[in-house]
């Protein structure tokens, strides 16, 4: 099964719908990236909400358009809140996305993530090591860094997508997005995206928000990856290093015009 290059024309069309809907995205993410994640969603036109208390998380997940679960700074109490939110989302048919940060390196989060899979995420986004570990094909990985190339994890991603009946995203120099039957590849971005904390976590939030859109989930999620790659490339051209990259990236998302990018690439 060979990946297909994702069509930027479709990404442009999807972005218009995304901005019109402005999906309310319930982000239960890690402490390190909350502000950057919220700003990324806002810059693209979504509406982020960081509701983390278990008493509030359960009812809020039912009224949100989408839910993100990111286990980067998982604790026992936070796990309880996340589980409550996912159960509520599942009952309300709210699409939820799992970001299994460092799932191959730490047992508590691995067991937690595996337990959540029975509640049917709409999407899973991780690097190669994380997807390999979640699929049961390999354990390891250096936290949020990856020791595997994204393409090497594609068979695991495809198998996981078929098993859970969801979209799986393996990110790297080229992102691969699969539903187990069809796979899309999204090149682009810039190495500077790996030199700041939070671009992967922010992508997971955008993926989660895109799952709230009508239409084919595979195309919507691939479009989300395309937006982030294009903004990263544009920001790198305007910045001198990691410090200036972050504001340039947010500006690039805010002004993103996929159709114009098509004309210049």
From Swiss-Prot:
<keyword id="KW-0479">Metal-binding</keyword>
<keyword id="KW-0808">Transferase</keyword>
<dbReference type="InterPro" id="IPR029056">
    <property type="entry name" value="Ribokinase-like"/>
</dbReference>
<keyword id="KW-0418">Kinase</keyword>
<comment type="similarity">
    <text>Belongs to the Thz kinase family.</text>
</comment>
<feature type="binding site">
    <location>
        <position position="198"/>
    </location>
    <ligand>
        <name>substrate</name>
    </ligand>
</feature>
<feature type="binding site">
    <location>
        <position position="50"/>
    </location>
    <ligand>
        <name>substrate</name>
    </ligand>
</feature>
<dbReference type="InterPro" id="IPR000417">
    <property type="entry name" value="Hyethyz_kinase"/>
</dbReference>
<dbReference type="GO" id="GO:0005524">
    <property type="term" value="F:ATP binding"/>
</dbReference>
<protein>
    <recommendedName>
        <fullName>Hydroxyethylthiazole kinase</fullName>
        <ecNumber>2.7.1.50</ecNumber>
    </recommendedName>
</protein>
<keyword id="KW-0067">ATP-binding</keyword>
<dbReference type="Pfam" id="PF02110">
    <property type="entry name" value="HK"/>
</dbReference>
<keyword id="KW-0547">Nucleotide-binding</keyword>
<keyword id="KW-0784">Thiamine biosynthesis</keyword>
<feature type="binding site">
    <location>
        <position position="171"/>
    </location>
    <ligand>
        <name>ATP</name>
    </ligand>
</feature>
<dbReference type="GO" id="GO:0009228">
    <property type="term" value="P:thiamine biosynthetic process"/>
</dbReference>
<dbReference type="GO" id="GO:0000287">
    <property type="term" value="F:magnesium ion binding"/>
</dbReference>
<feature type="binding site">
    <location>
        <position position="125"/>
    </location>
    <ligand>
        <name>ATP</name>
    </ligand>
</feature>
<dbReference type="GO" id="GO:0004417">
    <property type="term" value="F:hydroxyethylthiazole kinase activity"/>
</dbReference>
<comment type="pathway">
    <text>Cofactor biosynthesis; thiamine diphosphate biosynthesis; 4-methyl-5-(2-phosphoethyl)-thiazole from 5-(2-hydroxyethyl)-4-methylthiazole: step 1/1.</text>
</comment>
<dbReference type="GO" id="GO:0009229">
    <property type="term" value="P:thiamine diphosphate biosynthetic process"/>
</dbReference>
<comment type="function">
    <text>Catalyzes the phosphorylation of the hydroxyl group of 4-methyl-5-beta-hydroxyethylthiazole (THZ).</text>
</comment>
<keyword id="KW-0460">Magnesium</keyword>
């Amino acid at each position: 099964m060979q990946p297909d290059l994702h069509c930027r024309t479709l990404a442009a069309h999807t972005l218009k719908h995304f901005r019109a809907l402005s999906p309310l995205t319930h982000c239960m993410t890690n402490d390190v990236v909350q502000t950057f994640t919220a700003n990324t969603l806002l810059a693209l036109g979504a509406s982020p909400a960081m509701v983390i208390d278990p008493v509030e998380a359960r009812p809020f997940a039912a009224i949100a358009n989408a839910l993100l679960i990111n286990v980067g700074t998982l604790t026992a109490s936070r796990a309880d809140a996340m589980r409550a939110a996912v159960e509520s989302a599942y009952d309300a048919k709210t699409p939820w996305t799992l970001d299994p940060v460092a799932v191959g390196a730490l047992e508590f989060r691995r067991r937690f993530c595996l337990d959540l899979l029975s509640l049917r995420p709409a999407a899973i986004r991780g690097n190669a090591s994380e997807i390999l570990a979640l699929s049961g094909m390999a354990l390891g990985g250096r936290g949020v860094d990856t020791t595997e190339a994204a393409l090497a994890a594609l068979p695991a991603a495809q198998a996981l997508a078929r098993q859970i009946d969801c979209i799986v995203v393996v990110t790297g120099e080229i992102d691969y997005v699969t539903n187990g039957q069809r796979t899309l590849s999204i090149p682009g971005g810039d190495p500077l995206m790996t030199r700041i904390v939070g671009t992967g976590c922010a992508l997971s939030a955008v993926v989660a928000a895109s799952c709230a859109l009508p239409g084919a989930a595979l195309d919507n999620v691939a479009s989300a990856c395309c937006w982030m790659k294009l903004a990263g490339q544009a920001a790198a051209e305007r910045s001198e290093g990691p410090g200036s990259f972050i504001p340039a990236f947010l500006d690039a998302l805010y002004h993103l015009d996929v159709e114009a990018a098509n004309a210049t690439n």
